[in-house]
């Protein structure tokens, strides 16, 4: 029987997106070092704060997707991004709460 290791990350995201992404990267790298083939991040993993609409980003293409996609490719693992605020072109004041799954090829 083939062994499959999945990791669930719990983290305390705040209103500093870059700090949250750096923390998430550390947890992802730790999980990969322990043999995880799937890493699942929590809801609102990259930002929790008042400026949700301002911090919303395009998927794919935004900084969170780009960083996580690169990590999935580098570490050869599946990465479920919990959720992030995605830009809503029809109503920019109301971003979507979106999750996405990244394959090992990024």
Which residues make up each language-model segment?
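A generic structural signal for ordered alpha-helices
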Residues: 2, 9, 46-50
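Active-site-proximal beta-strand elements of phosphoester/diester hydrolases
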Residues: 3-15, 40, 98
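Cys-nucleophile CN-hydrolase/nitrilase-fold catalytic domain and related Cys-dependent amidase chemistry
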Residues: 17, 26-104
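PLP-dependent aminotransferase-class I/II
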Residues: 23
């Amino acid at each position: 029987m083939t062994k499959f290791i999945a990791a669930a990350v719990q983290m305390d995201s705040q209103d500093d997106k870059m700090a949250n992404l750096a923390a998430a990267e550390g947890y992802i790298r730790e999980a990969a070092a322990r043999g995880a083939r799937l890493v699942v991040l929590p809801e609102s993993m990259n930002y929790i704060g008042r400026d949700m609409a301002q911090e919303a980003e395009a998927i794919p293409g935004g900084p969170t997707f780009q960083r996580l996609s690169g990590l999935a490719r580098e570490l050869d693992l599946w990465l479920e991004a919990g959720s992030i605020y995605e830009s809503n072109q029809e109503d920019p004041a109301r971003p979507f709460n979106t999750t996405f799954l990244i394959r090992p090829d990024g």
